[in-house]
Amino acid sequence: MLLLSCNLEEDDLKSLLETGASVNAPPDPQEQSPAHLAAGGGLACFLLWQLQTGADLNQQDVLGETPLHKAAKVGSLDCLSLLVASDVQIGVCNKNGQTAEDLAWSYGFPECARFLTMIKCMQTARSSGEQQERDPRAPVLRQKRSFRTVESGVMKRKC
């Protein structure tokens, strides 16, 4: 049933865009693109269609918010996942200096906030790993570090 309703909404919105408006054109005074509206409404199916038609998922509205901010404000983990999988920039701040992660926490969506925190950590680790690969000392940096715990005397890897 959800797919049916998404398809109907998608068809309606698709016909609006087929009238000649750009997929990234802000349709309202708030400068929200169709991707902003889809993410803010938690409509992952329409957001996916926006992706397939070339929407700029990093476009900011008058508040400086991207579709990622909108999805975080409504707690749409589906939209957040789709946006992150599309390599959206997660560190963008709105005009109040808030990231999507900050908004998820402040709007009471801890699951979404933890998801964005995890993605941010993974991206940081990935970029750190890429820097190490370019570093001539990389083999030394990749060696495991261990320490002996006082209680057990067992060697453990230290993260």
From Swiss-Prot:
Q: Where is the protein localized?
A: Nucleus; Cytoplasm
List cellular component terms (GO). cytoplasm; cytosol; male germ cell nucleus; mitochondrion; nucleoplasm
- InterPro entries the UniProt entry points to: Ank_Repeat/CDKN_Inhibitor (IPR050776), Ankyrin_rpt (IPR002110), Ankyrin_rpt-contain_sf (IPR036770)
The residue spans of each ANK repeat are 1-25, 30-59, 63-92
Cytoplasm as a keyword of this entry, yes or no, is yes
Q: Which SUPFAM superfamilies match?
A: Ankyrin repeat
Keywords linked to the UniProt accession: ANK repeat, Cytoplasm, Nucleus, Repeat, Ubl conjugation
| Coiled-coil positions | none
Which protein are we looking at?
Ankyrin repeat domain-containing protein 37
Name of the gene: Ankrd37
